[in-house]
Design a protein with these regions (language model features):
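C-terminal helical cap(s) of enzyme catalytic domains, especially alpha/beta-barrels
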Residues: 19, 68, 72, 92, ...
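Conserved anion-binding
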Residues: 1-89
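Conserved active-site loop/cleft motifs that coordinate metal ions or position small ligands
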Residues: 78-80, 99-103
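Short glycine/proline-rich, acidic loop/turn segments that cap or connect secondary-structure elements
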Residues: 89-97
Length: 127
């Protein structure tokens, strides 16, 4: 199809995701702001194929990864929020995400920085 994957960052509910599935077979990623352990359960209940766990503030800061301790995360999850080449290894090893989402952590002056991106890829390949 024309859409390969759908990533939702709004207030979409389970009914919205169900209706979206009727229109496309593309995998759905639902992003969530993680402030409490209950936030993890709420996003999982929406029925997306993947969940993206994020600080959600756009500040380049990580959320408290200890909120994931003991959490039963059923869907494969993406880890986002404040990840940089310098903290990527520790974050990935501690929470074991399916995937990582990098943005401002690989930028210099709000532009993607080739060297930072290459360093992040090197770190991931070493895991």
């Amino acid at each position: 199809g024309i859409i390969d994957v759908i990533q939702l960052h709004g207030d979409e509910d389970a009914d919205f995701i169900r209706r979206l599935r009727e229109l496309t077979s593309a995998p759905i990623i639902k992003a969530a702001k993680i402030r409490t352990p209950e936030d993890i359960g709420r996003v999982q209940a929406l029925g997306a194929d993947y969940v993206l766990l994020d600080n959600g503030t756009g500040t380049g800061e990580m959320f408290d990864h200890s909120l994931l301790d003991g959490a039963e995360i059923r869907q494969p999850f993406f880890l986002a929020g404040g990840l940089t080449p310098e903290n990527l290894r520790q974050a990935a090893e501690s929470v074991r995400p399916y995937c990582v989402d990098l943005s401002s952590g690989v930028e210099t002056d709000r532009l993607k920085d080739r060297e930072k991106m290459l360093e992040a890829v090197r770190v991931i390949r070493e895991l």
